[in-house]
C-alpha cells in the first residue's frame, strides 16, 4: 500500500555534499524585493562614501583635522559596503554561504573590525568637536593634523588587531565546542562567540558610545549658549572681522549638530544588533534567523546613511558632489575651488 502523503522536499545549499546546510529560500517576489533593497544599501555605502573620501582628499579647502577623520570614517563605511554587505546580501537572501569557510572568517573579522573602527572614529570626532566648541582659541594648537593622524591610526590598528586576534586564534568559541560542532555544516557562516567575548564586545561598543553621548550633551548645551550670544551681538556687529567670526561660529555649530546626528544614527543602527548578540549569548543562541538578519542589516545600513546625512546638512558636500559628477574635478585648478558660501 502506498501513502497519499509525500515527505516535504528538503533543499540543501549543496545537493551533492554530505553535511550540507539546509536552504530556506524566500519566494521569488520576496527575493527580488530583498535583493533590490540590499543592493541599494550596498551601492550607496560604496559610492556615497567614495564621494566623501574624494571630496575631502581632493579639495584643499577641506583639508582639516576633522575632515580627515570624516574621510577615514567614510573609508571604514566604504569597506563595509565592499567586503561585508555584498556577501551578506547573498547569505541573507539565499540562506546559504557560498564563499567558503576561510572567507567566512575573513568576512566576520572585517565586520567586527570596521564596526569598532567606526566607533573609535566617531569618538575622536566628538573629542575634536568638544575642543573646538569649549576652547576655540587654542583648538588649532591642540588638535592638529598630526594629532588627527594619530587618532586615525589608533582607529584602524586597534580594531584590526583585536578582531584578527579573536577570530584567527579561535578564542571566540572557547568552551562552546559541542555547540559549534552541532551547528557546523557546509554552506553556513555562523560565528559563535562565547559569553565572555560577547560581554567584552558589548563594553567596547558601550563605553565609547557613552563617552560620545556625554560629550555631545555638553557640546549642544554650549552651542545653545553660543547661539543666544550670537543673536544678541549680531545686530551690534560693525567690523567685517567680527562678522566673519560669527559666520565661522555658526558653521562650527552646524558641524557639531551634523556630527551629533551622525552619532545618533550610529547608535540607533548598531544598538539592536549589539543587544541581540548579548542576549543571545546568555540565552543559548535562540534568536530566530530573521530577527538576527534584521539586526545585522540595521547595522549595515548605517554605513550608507552617513553620506546622506552629509548631503542633507553640508552645502559644501553637495557642491563637491556636483563638481565630481560633472567632471569639473578633473580640471587642473579644481582642488582650489571654494566650497563654502562665505
From Swiss-Prot:
Gene3D superfamilies xref list: Rhodopsin 7-helix transmembrane proteins (1.20.1070.10)
Similarity section: Belongs to the G-protein coupled receptor 1 family.
Disulphide connectivity of cysteines: 21-185, 104-189
Topology class, membrane: Multi-pass membrane protein
Chain segments annotated as transmembrane: 32-52, 68-88, 112-132, 147-167, 196-216, 259-279, 281-301
Tissue: Expressed in kidney and amygdala. Not expressed in other tissues or brain regions tested.
Function according to Swiss-Prot or TrEMBL: Olfactory receptor specific for trace amines. Trace amine compounds are enriched in animal body fluids and act on trace amine-associated receptors (TAARs) to elicit both intraspecific and interspecific innate behaviors. Ligand-binding causes a conformation change that triggers signaling via G alpha proteins, possibly G(i)/G(o) G alpha proteins.
Cytoplasmic side: 53-67, 133-146, 217-258, 302-342
Keyword hit for Phosphoprotein: no
Keywords: Cell membrane, Disulfide bond, G-protein coupled receptor, Glycoprotein, Membrane, Receptor, Transducer, Transmembrane, Transmembrane helix
One GO CC annotation: plasma membrane
Positions of glycan attachment: 4, 18
Name of the protein this chain belongs to: Trace amine-associated receptor 8
Gene that this sequence comes from: TAAR8
InterPro entries named among the record's database cross-references: GPCR_Rhodpsn, GPCR_Rhodpsn_7TM, TAAR, TAAR_fam
Location in the cell: Cell membrane
GO annotation (BP), single: G protein-coupled receptor signaling pathway
Extracellular topological domain residue ranges: 1-31, 89-111, 168-195, 280
Amino acid at each position: 500500500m502506498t501513502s497519499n502523503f509525500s515527505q516535504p522536499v528538503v533543499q540543501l545549499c549543496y545537493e551533492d555534499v554530505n553535511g550540507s546546510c539546509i536552504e530556506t529560500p524566500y519566494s521569488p517576489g520576496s527575493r527580488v524585493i530583498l535583493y533590490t533593497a540590499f543592493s541599494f544599501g550596498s551601492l550607496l555605502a560604496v559610492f556615497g562614501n567614495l564621494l566623501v573620501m574624494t571630496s575631502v582628499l581632493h579639495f584643499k579647502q577641506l583639508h582639516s583635522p576633522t575632515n580627515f577623520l570624516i574621510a577615514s570614517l567614510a573609508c571604514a563605511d566604504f569597506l563595509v559596503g565592499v567586503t561585508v554587505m555584498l556577501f551578506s546580501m547573498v547569505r541573507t537572501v539565499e540562506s546559504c554561504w557560498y564563499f567558503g569557510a576561510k572567507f567566512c572568517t575573513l568576512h566576520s573579522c572585517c565586520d567586527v573590525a570596521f564596526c569598532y573602527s567606526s566607533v573609535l572614529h566617531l569618538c575622536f570626532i566628538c573629542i575634536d568637536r568638544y575642543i573646538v566648541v569649549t576652547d576655540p582659541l587654542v583648538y588649532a594648537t591642540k588638535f592638529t593634523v598630526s594629532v588627527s593622524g594619530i587618532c586615525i591610526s589608533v582607529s584602524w590598528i586597534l580594531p584590526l588587531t583585536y578582531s584578527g586576534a579573536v577570530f584567527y586564534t579561535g578564542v571566540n568559541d572557547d568552551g562552546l565546542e559541542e555547540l559549534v560542532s552541532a551547528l557546523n555544516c557546509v554552506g553556513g557562516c555562523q560565528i559563535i562567540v562565547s559569553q565572555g567575548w560577547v560581554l567584552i564586545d558589548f563594553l567596547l561598543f558601550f563605553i565609547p558610545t557613552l563617552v560620545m553621548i556625554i560629550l555631545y550633551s555638553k557640546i549642544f548645551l554650549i552651542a545653545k549658549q553660543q547661539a543666544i550670544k550670537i543673536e544678541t551681538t549680531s545686530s551690534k556687529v560693525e567690523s567685517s572681522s567680527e562678522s566673519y567670526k560669527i559666520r565661522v561660529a555658526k558653521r562650527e555649530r552646524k558641524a557639531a549638530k551634523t556630527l551629533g546626528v551622525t552619532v545618533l544614527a550610529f547608535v540607533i543602527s548598531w544598538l539592536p544588533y549589539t543587544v541581540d548578540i548579548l542576549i543571545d549569548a546568555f540565552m543559548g543562541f535562540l534568536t530566530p534567523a530573521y530577527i538576527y538578519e534584521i539586526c545585522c542589516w540595521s547595522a549595515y545600513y548605517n554605513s550608507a546613511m552617513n553620506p546622506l546625512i552629509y548631503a542633507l546638512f553640508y552645502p559644501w558636500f553637495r557642491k563637491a558632489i556636483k563638481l565630481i559628477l560633472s567632471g569639473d574635478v578633473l580640471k587642473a585648478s579644481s582642488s582650489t575651488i571654494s566650497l563654502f558660501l562665505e
